[in-house]
Amino acid sequence: MSIASDANEMQGEIARFRHELHQEPEIGLDLPRTQEKVLKALDGLPYEITLGESTTSVTAVLRGGAAHASARKPAVLLRADMDGLPVQERTGVEFSSKIDGAMHACGHDLHTSMLAGAATLLAERRDQLAGDVVLMFQPGEEGFDGAGHMIREGVLDAAGRRVDAAYGMHVFSSLEPYGQFCTKPGVMMSASDGLFVTVLGAGGHGSAPHAAKDPVTAAAEMVTALQVMITRQFNMFDPVVLTVGVLQAGTKRNVIPESARFEATIRTFSEASRERMMTAIPQLLKGIASAHGLEVDVDYRGEYPMTVTDEDETHTAENVISDMFGGSRLSRWATPISGSEDFSRVLAEVPGTFVGLSAVPRGVDHTTSAFNHSPYATFDDGVLSDGAALYAELAVSRIATLAAGN
């Protein structure tokens, strides 16, 4: 039977595993229950297992048993992230989160269950593989740089040498119709940086602002000035997104506080714009503070680089998708999206690509459905077997071409 047929036979099993994961989401780098579930799913399969030291990651290596013509035995990496979000679930599904304040609102439970399904599909084809497969079950994608932790601990060399190609996948609860696969060569997702600003003034009575140094008005001016700077100083065809999500000052309406603070997320799509933001923002904010006779502390933190996919590996994935599911289920995005991913760290080290998969519930309008990270984000189980099949087929197909010297 084909990989797709075998995956369809496993649909119920993969869905049950996904529901188990969904009911017990964990956040960050320490996911002991999730790790235990993954290890149970891999139990009895011929994988070499390595557990993370700084995280509860799982790295599983399958040694292919077929002969290979290449001088160097190829290796391919498949990645799934495993962590949830600090969100109170409001979907109402039967398998809703049992953990207060935690939810798999970004679909990582689907990624993990699909890769676990692919582990079985690949193990059944071990003798056909002329190379090795590295499965990367990663904690801490949601702001904890789990990929960076795993790279530092050697996941890219887990097969005994650097992997030749790497593939990741991400489901969406909106954006595209149900079952649609999405690709984009080159810059696919933005870089993500954090901005943390504290404006330092001198407190006083609200009735006598002249006798104080008001950090609130200066902070408000900074927030609006940042948006003006972007529209005046940056090319509209090389977009920059800056959103202030935290703005805090004071505790009483008639008291001028000593400080005000705000935090922002910054998304860029080129290294030139990213580097320019790193210098332009402190310059602007310090200028405003100086004009008001205040001090300002500007902490600009580089977080994740752009997700840049390899053109050849993207074509490989597109061909596999078209062959397995038909060309009508493949969309190539014309522009990047402003979300960010720490799989970008993997793609900065080895050639690879990232595939989107719409899990919008069937019958729901993808243009109005709740987006990832929403407490109402709902993902359709129906894509699980397709995702597992794609993971497995990507490894099988790419190892075959690499072993043939291509």
Regions found by a protein language model. Name each.
Residues 10-17, 30-41, 74, 102, ...:
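General structural feature for long, well-ordered alpha-helical segments within catalytic domains
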Residues 85-87, 91-103, 109-110, 122-246, ...:
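Histidine/acidic-residue-rich, glycine-tolerant segments that coordinate divalent metal ions
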Residues 1-104, 109, 113-129:
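Acidic/His- and Gly-rich active-site-bordering loop/insert found
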Residues 220-406:
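Metal-dependent amide/peptide-bond hydrolase catalytic core
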Residues 74-77, 132-134, 163-167, 220, ...:
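Structural motif
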Residues 21, 60, 78, 108, ...:
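Divalent metal-coordination and catalytic microenvironments
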